[in-house]
Amino acid sequence: MVSNNIPQVKLGIIAVSRDCFPIALSTQRRENIIKEYKGEIFNCQTTVENEKDMLKAVAEVKEQGCNALVVFLGNFGPETPETLIAKNFDGPVMFVAAAEGDGDMINGRGDAYCGMLNCSYNLGMRHLKGYIPEYPVGTAEEVAKMIADFVPVARVILGLKGLKIITFGPRPQDFFACNAPIKGLYELGVEIEENSELDLLVAYKEHANDPRIDEVCADMAKEMGEGCYYPDLSRRMAQFELTLLDWAEAHKGSRQYVAFADKCWPAFPSQFGFEPCYVNSRLVSRGIPVACEVDVYGALSEYIGMCASDDTVTLLDINNSVPRYIYDEDIKGKYDYKLTDTFMGFHCGNTPQCKMCSSRKIKYQLIQNRLLENGCTPDFTRGTLEGDIAASDITFYRLQCDSEGNLRSYIAEGEVLDVPTRSFGGIGIFAINEMGRFYRHVLIQKGYPHHGAVAFSHVGKTLFEVFKYLGIKDIAYNQPASLPYPTENPWK
């Protein structure tokens, strides 16, 4: 996904060397990594042995525009200068070390395995953050793989550092589950701007007859195709899209990136003249999350997932169980899942059309039509993007600040099955191993909201590393049956 709302990672690598070891060990091993790594990376030629070297190297990578850094211990490394790199460089830093085997065991032994221990100890003493991979010691080929894995982690960290979440309206009544203590946002370095629905309505009216509306309408028609949208509704929706985009640009302030969390019912459709879901889907497909029902941490989670996957995402209700007859007809014997491993993820119509089956259409919100239009011919309840979500690998996840002000998270990898839902909305049949147990002992037990963010690939590894880096102490996942949850009854 190409988006100017997601940071571009510009990597640099600095090799470090302890002065009682041959400096050539670090420099040559660094060059070997450069040859193996397939992406773009600035190869800093200053090898750090002391604090003056450190200042020189950091100045060089900054001058080259690097915003993320690899510190490579080609030998034992100088623990003070190498950790001060993280202090003096304003961006995420990964620390990795060289494995032995590319030389003899006399002059060719670097002891970086040992040096990594001193490095981590010094980072801790200085209260500095450094990203250290699961096993940080490797050959040139292995370190190159670690660097590739670091890129999405760095992208998330840089994104959060520059993010502002913009909200419109309070949470709807009886939707307190989407609570949003802002303390957690500030702990993550994220800014928030909270506005009234009236502010949005005023801005929307000011965009009436905007000369750009026709162009947006044409783009909507091209995206959806003939017979898959309401031509008479397009101008209203285009006007709203321009309103949000202009608001984002005018209200970024000191920040580079934005996400929205907007109130979308009950007053919105009757006052704006449509449901905002399709417009929301268009923005998230371009890298700007618009979370439903003022779900601030849903918007935050969506943004994290976009940076982690470098792709668009969605936000869904963990909505309903799969009927036994659908399981028996279309899942049992075809997929290796129990009925309780499956559920339906649903929202009114905010999932990007590029992640939906080809039969998707702009329709009307059935539930709101019952409530607001008495089930009559739909008018202002139109605007939802409906259809089955296309089969895909997925990661279901969320980062949430709970009612006590503590940041917690969960991650579960799975898939959207190629099985018709036979239902309405933007909806799909999801399958996650041991979902039933995860549902009870994580989602229910720990009081998570009913909204979950969805990335359309397996990015659990990246998200886990990101949450660790951010200092999230509780990172839950769908544990296998062989690993019971603390609250799981052993006599069940």
Role assignments for model-derived ranges:
Residues 66-75, 94-96, 257-262:
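Periplasmic-binding protein-like
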Residues 2-37:
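N-terminal basic/disordered segments at the start of proteins
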Residues 365-492:
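Extended hydrophobic packing segments that form well-structured cores
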Residues 84-111, 118-124, 129, 282-294:
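Short, acidic/small-residue loops that bind anionic groups at enzyme active sites
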Residues 54-66, 83-85, 243-253:
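Short, well-structured alpha-helical segments in soluble
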Residues 217, 222-308:
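Long, internal scaffold/assembly segments composed of regular secondary structure
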Residues 4, 9-11, 40-42, 102-229, ...:
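Cap/lid and interdomain-hinge subdomains that line or gate substrate/regulatory clefts
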Residues 284-421:
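C-terminal catalytic subdomain
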